[in-house]
Amino acid sequence: MHIQDWNSETDPQIIRREKQKARIIRQSQWWKNKRAHNKCYYCKTDTPARKLTMDHVVPLARGGRSIKSNLVPCCKSCNNLKKNLLPLEWENFLSNFR
């Protein structure tokens, strides 16, 4: 990946388009089924489905996409703490947090 490619990944138009895709996916049966387990993907806390948020494992700002393999249900606490961290960065953060 070149620097130019990285910049194109975080283009505001691309991020807007990916957020729109996420809104559509949020209405899908697939997403309703994912939330039905009532568990945060990250901390495994029991959380009512209506309180689970959609998180991009690889954040949009870091080149992630709104595709099923990149979307997980998570509690608001984890989503707020994770922000734009990549999975390895998130794991390191949690290790230091504990």
Each PLM stretch: what is its role?
Residues 41-44, 77:
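Short, cysteine/histidine-rich loop/knuckle motifs that typically chelate Zn2+
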Residues 53-59:
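Histidine-centered catalytic micro-motifs used for acid/base chemistry in nuclease
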Residues 49-50, 81-85:
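Short, non-ligating residues that shape and space the ligands of small metal-coordination modules
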Residues 63-81:
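Short beta-strand-alpha-helix junction that forms the catalytic/metal-binding core
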Residues 2-42:
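Short, charged surface segments at domain edges that flank catalytic/cofactor-binding sites
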Residues 38, 52, 69, 73:
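Cys/His-enriched microdomains
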